[in-house]
Each structure stands twice: as structure tokens, then as C-alpha cells.
């Protein structure tokens, strides 16, 4: 998938790191509400082998960029304009999040908004990158 600047990212590019893949859209209120806790999680694990990839579902770069400029978030935003990737992951509800281990295997999947600063979620991710 392309990021907001047009660079292509593949999950394989992140092998060796845990990846939180979050599917979202600007029209999805729960998606917008969970973004700050995703950023807190990212910051709390800064410097470790962990990355957040936020996949915007069905919207264009301008819509996604406008959103990101209003909210200071330090993770990578990707665009799934045709929703094929979203469907391939089985993300029928937004937000949908998948935690992929450093080996590339999906370890956890969550449907609906979460508070990513919860200790149990942080501990599950930390266990993957220790």
C-alpha cells in the first residue's frame, strides 16, 4: 500500500518488528477516538522493534492527510482506496486492528475501538519484541 507521500510499504518490509496494523476511516468516530491511545502506545515503545501502520479504508490521500494534520500522530498512514487489502484481512468492522509478530505471523486481532494504553495490550506487544 502507498503512504500519504506515495511511497509503497509492504508488511514484509517490517519483518523483525512487531506491527500493529490498524484499519480506520475519517468518518468512523470510534476510529478517531482511539487514535490518541495508539499514539501513546507508539511513544511508550519508541526505540523498540514496534511500528504502527494505520490503513485508511476507502478514502483518498487528501482526506487522510487533512485528518492527520489536525491530530499530531507519529505513525505511518497507508491508503487502501479500493478496500481490497481491508477485505483480505477480514476487517469488516472499523476500527479493526491486527498485531503481527516479528516473524510475520498474525498474533492478535481486535475489532472495535480499544484503549491502547491498557496494560494487558501493552504487555502482549512487549512480549513479542523482547
What are these regions (language model features)?
Residues 24-27, 31, 89, 116:
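Signature tryptophan residues that serve as conserved aromatic anchors
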Residues 17-19, 23-27, 93:
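Short pre-active-site segment immediately N-terminal to redox-active cysteine/selenocysteine motifs
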Residues 66-74, 80-127:
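Thiol/disulfide oxidoreductase modules built on the thioredoxin-like
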Residues 20-22, 52-54, 99:
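Hydrophobic beta-strand core positions in alpha/beta domains
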Residues 1-19, 42:
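A short beta-strand-turn-helix
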Residues 16-18, 48-50, 75:
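Loop/turn elements at helix/coil->beta-strand transitions in domains of secreted/extracellular proteins
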Residues 32-71, 81-88, 123:
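Structural microenvironment flanking redox-active thiols in thiol-disulfide oxidoreductases
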